[in-house]
């Protein structure tokens, strides 16, 4: 059996590949892997490397500042050395941490208590073209512009913010794996519902994204329409 791939295999993938070659079939390879690893084996935790060589994927972010690359094979019987506080996503140079729960216990809420300013200085924050909105990757900056009028039910911890439309799309295309990690971490899955983004369309409205079908819309009045909010933070690697 020979597998050709142009992508370098990780250590775990190389081990599984060699095990499959040795056993000759997937069923026996899975049994051998279970025997070797054992049900009580703890997934390896590694301090986030500073070299930028961190593998792309979904990570379990721990309270002690470490992160574990999440494997879909993990079960509730896999133990962790410390509490999981967020889910990390790395895609090339892009990284983001996703909170374990929606704000306001998952209720649909308004984004703000009133409209934002419409002064010349505010205009730099408003994006009315789809292509530009999708390219918006600065949710932290956007949230700072909203912070003084933000709904009080949105209780953002330090350095946490509401994702921009561009950041949300990167989360959306990885939703299946992120939700598996959220379930493992005893968090709440991202729902097939509308979520607020921090990308403002105008003084009165902001862009929203449906996690059910990826559709986005911009005529949503920030102070009256109600949608879900999920906070994020920078994932430094």
Per-region residue spans from a language model:
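C-terminal, surface-exposed recognition/capping segments
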Residues: 3-6, 17, 39, 158-159, ...
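Short, compositionally biased
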Residues: 2-156, 223-237
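Hydrophobic core segments of beta-strands in well-ordered, beta-rich domains
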Residues: 99, 162-163
């Amino acid at each position: 059996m020979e597998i050709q791939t142009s992508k370098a295999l990780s250590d775990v993938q190389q081990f599984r590949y060699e095990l499959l070659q040795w056993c000759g079939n997937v069923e026996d390879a899975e049994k051998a892997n279970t025997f070797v690893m054992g049900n009580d084996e703890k997934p390896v935790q590694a301090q986030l490397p500073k070299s930028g060589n961190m593998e792309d994927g979904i990570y379990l972010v721990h309270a002690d500042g470490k992160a574990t690359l999440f494997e879909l094979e993990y079960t509730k019987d896999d133990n962790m050395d410390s509490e999981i506080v967020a889910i990390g996503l790395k895609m090339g140079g892009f990284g983001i941490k996703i909170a374990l729960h929606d704000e306001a216990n998952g209720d649909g809420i308004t984004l703000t208590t009133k409209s934002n300013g419409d002064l010349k200085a505010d205009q730099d924050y408003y994006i009315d073209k789809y292509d530009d909105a999708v390219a918006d990757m600065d949710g932290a900056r956007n949230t700072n512009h909203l912070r003084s009028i933000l709904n009080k039910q949105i209780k953002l911890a330090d350095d946490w913010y509401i994702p921009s439309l561009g950041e949300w799309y990167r989360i959306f295309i990885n939703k299946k794996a992120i939700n598996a990690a959220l379930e493992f971490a005893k968090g709440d899955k991202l729902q097939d519902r509308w979520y607020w983004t921090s990308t403002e369309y105008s003084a009165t409205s902001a862009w929203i994204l449906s996690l059910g079908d990826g559709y986005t819309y911009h005529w949503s009045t920030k102070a009256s329409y109600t949608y879900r909010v999920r906070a994020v933070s920078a994932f430094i690697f």
